[in-house]
Amino acid sequence: MVNRLKEKYDNEIVPSLMEKFNYTSIMQAPKVDKIVINMGVGDAVSNAKRLDEAVDELTLIAGQKPVITKAKKSIAGFRLREGMAIGAKVTLRGQRMYEFLDKLVSVSLPRVRDFHGVSKRAFDGRGNYTLGIREQLIFPEIDFDDVNKVRGMDIVIVTTANTDEESRELLTQLGMPFAK
């Protein structure tokens, strides 16, 4: 079964982008390549159970088991040793990526308190968009009663676009609610 957002991309967004940016081939049209969700768990240094909770929550949110990230350097001020587990990340591609993006845009972001749209300035100059979320409770899979600690996460949407303008147009047409 083809995802609703993937179908919209193929049938409506690609022709629209080709017309707007004067592409000669449909392969020039930018597309979402992958979505990386990263959750840093700073208190995993003192309490290893916190990391397991974060992994479980990220598994529920992404529908895929995350990879545990380890510290690259030792930092004495944070009581951190090189190689200690300090977070979790998951990379979504294909069907799961479109399902997550659809859920993020249509269900999760509207549940954010005092939400007026996401920043237009969070592009990196190469067509990738980074979004910070302050609490994992905006996702429908997370049960409020089971959460011990509110954690944020970073969501990076990697596109094949060459410029920020192309990427912004792609994400706008996919339904990303940018601030006015």
Curated annotation (Swiss-Prot):
Keywords, sorted A to Z: Ribonucleoprotein, Ribosomal protein, RNA-binding, rRNA-binding, tRNA-binding
Gene Ontology molecular function: rRNA binding; structural constituent of ribosome; tRNA binding
SUPFAM superfamilies xrefs: RL5-like
One Pfam family per UniProt: Ribosomal_L5_C
PROSITE patterns, alphabetized: RIBOSOMAL_L5
GO annotation, cellular component aspect: ribonucleoprotein complex; ribosome
Keyword Ribonucleoprotein: yes
One of the protein's GO biological processes: translation
Listed InterPro entries: Ribosomal_uL5, Ribosomal_uL5_bac-type, Ribosomal_uL5_C, Ribosomal_uL5_CS, Ribosomal_uL5_dom_sf, Ribosomal_uL5_N
Function: This is one of the proteins that bind and probably mediate the attachment of the 5S RNA into the large ribosomal subunit, where it forms part of the central protuberance. In the 70S ribosome it contacts protein S13 of the 30S subunit (bridge B1b), connecting the 2 subunits; this bridge is implicated in subunit movement. Contacts the P site tRNA; the 5S rRNA and some of its associated proteins might help stabilize positioning of ribosome-bound tRNAs.
HAMAP family given in the database record: Ribosomal_uL5_B
Quaternary structure annotation from Swiss-Prot or TrEMBL: Part of the 50S ribosomal subunit; part of the 5S rRNA/L5/L18/L25 subcomplex. Contacts the 5S rRNA and the P site tRNA. Forms a bridge to the 30S subunit in the 70S ribosome.
Family listed: Belongs to the universal ribosomal protein uL5 family.
Protein name: Large ribosomal subunit protein uL5
Phylogenetic placement of the source organism: Bacteria, Bacillati, Bacillota, Bacilli, Lactobacillales
